[in-house]
C-alpha cells in the first residue's frame, strides 16, 4: 500500500529540511525510547525557531516515514519502536534501453537496500524535467542518481553516472564512472598486438570522450598518427548511419582489418552493415565494442569492454546515501570502477604475408 505524504510548498520545505535532518539523526541514534512521547509541535517550534504549522508538518513527515506514530486520543505522537523502513528514498532518473542500464539499476537497488533505503525509478520526458525536479524536492525523496539528463538544477544531492566534472569542478558535483580511458586504451592495444594497423574507429560525440582518447593514445604509441582521420562520428545509432559510415570507411581505407566502436550498439549495427555489404568479416576483420551487452558467450565473433554496471550502480547508491547522511567527506568526488576486456580471443590476427 502506498504511503500518503503531506503536500508541501517549496518555501516551507526549505524551513523544514534542517528540522527534519536533526530530528532524523536523533531518532536514528535512539535518543528517544521506544513508544516514548515525542516533543509536541509547540516544543519543536520553540526549539527550532519556526512556527507551529512548520513544526506540525515536520512531525507529519516523520510519521509518514515511519519514525513516529500517532497514539490514541490524548496520547499525542509517539516514537516508533524500531528503525523505520525505509530510512529514506532515492530516485534514479535514467533511461532503460538495454541490459547495461538494467544491470546498473539492479546494482543501485541492491546498494540502497543494503542501507535500508528504497530506490524509485523514473524516466520523465526532458521537457517535463524542471517541474518534475520541483515535485521531487517536495517529496520524501532525499537524493538523485542520474545518467541521462545532464546536470540537474535541484537542491537535492545528486550522483551523476558516467559524467566527468566540469573544469573547474563544482563543489556539489559527484560522479561515478567506469575507467573509460583504460577500456579504450587496452582494447586498442589488443587489436594492435594482433598486427592490425589499417584500423577505423566508429564513435559518437555523446559517448564518454575518454574512450576515444584511449584509442588515440594506443594508436599514437604504435606510430599511427592519422587516428583522427580514421575516426568517423555517427549522428545516432541507426542502420542508416552504420551503412553510410561503412561506405565512407571502405572508400578512404580500403582493406581495413579492424573496426573499434565506441559502444556495443554501434558494434551491432556495424556487424549488420558489413553483412548487408556482403563482406565476409567473421574471423577476418576485428570488431570491438564497449558495454559487453552480449555477455561472455556472444553470438557474434566480437570483443567488448565490461563496464561492470552492477558495481557502478551499487557504488553510486552508497555514495549518494553518504551525501544524504552528511558523510560527503568520506567519498571521492569522482569514483572510478575498473573495466574488463571480454572475448578478446575473437580478435583475429592479421595473416602474415
Where are these regions (language model features)?
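Extreme N-terminal segment that seeds HTH/winged-HTH DNA-binding domains in transcriptional regulators
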Residues: 1-49, 53, 57-60, 332-334
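Flexible loop/turn connectors
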Residues: 247-353
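Alpha-helical recognition/docking segments in bacterial nutrient-uptake
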Residues: 6-7, 19-25, 33, 43, ...
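Hydrophobic alpha-helical segments within soluble ligand-binding/sensing domains
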Residues: 19, 165, 171-201, 211, ...
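Periplasmic-binding protein-like
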Residues: 91-93, 140-148, 200-204, 231, ...
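Short beta-strand elements in bilobed, periplasmic/extracellular small-molecule ligand-binding domains
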Residues: 112-124, 200, 216-241
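An alpha-beta-alpha
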Residues: 187-224, 329-348
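Short, Lys/Arg-rich nucleic-acid/phosphate-binding segment
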Residues: 37-40, 70-84
